[in-house]
A protein has these predicted regions:
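Conserved RNA-binding domains used in RNP assembly and mRNA/RNA metabolism
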Residues: 2-110
Length: 110
C-alpha cells in the first residue's frame, strides 16, 4: 500500500500532466491537471475536463461515452479539492490520443 501512496504522490507532484481522475462522486474524468498546495489548501486545477462513461454498444462490446464535465459552462479551468478525489493516474499515450480527439470533437459539437 505504501508503494501505491508514493506512486500517487509522485503523480500529484508533477507540474502539469494529462490524467485520469476518479472522484468520490463516481465520475471519471480525463483532463490536464496541475496540483496546487498553498495557503488555501490542496487542490487540483483541471483544464478542459471531459467525463468518460463506459457504455455497452449494440454488438455487446464496451464503448466510451464522452461529454464535457461542466455541460453549461464555457470555462476551461476548474478547481477540485483533493479530498474529493479517490485516485489520479497519468494516462498512456493511447488514452492521450483519445482525449485530444474527443476534445476536438466536443469543441466542434458545442
Amino acid at each position: 500500500m505504501n508503494s501505491l501512496m508514493s506512486q500517487s504522490r509522485r503523480v500529484m507532484d508533477k507540474t502539469e500532466f494529462l490524467a485520469a481522475i476518479k472522484l468520490v462522486s463516481g465520475e471519471e474524468l480525463l483532463s490536464m491537471v496541475t496540483s496546487v498546495h498553498d495557503e488555501n489548501g490542496d487542490y487540483l486545477i483541471v483544464e478542459n475536463p471531459i467525463e468518460v462513461e463506459e457504455v455497452m454498444l449494440p454488438n455487446k462490446q464496451a464503448g466510451a461515452k464522452v461529454q464535457p464535465w461542466m455541460k453549461f459552462s464555457r470555462e476551461e479551468q476548474f478547481v477540485i479539492p483533493k479530498d474529493k478525489i479517490i485516485t489520479i493516474v497519468e494516462v498512456t499515450e493511447e488514452v492521450a490520443v483519445f482525449y485530444h480527439m474527443s476534445l476536438r470533437k466536443l469543441n466542434t459539437d458545442f
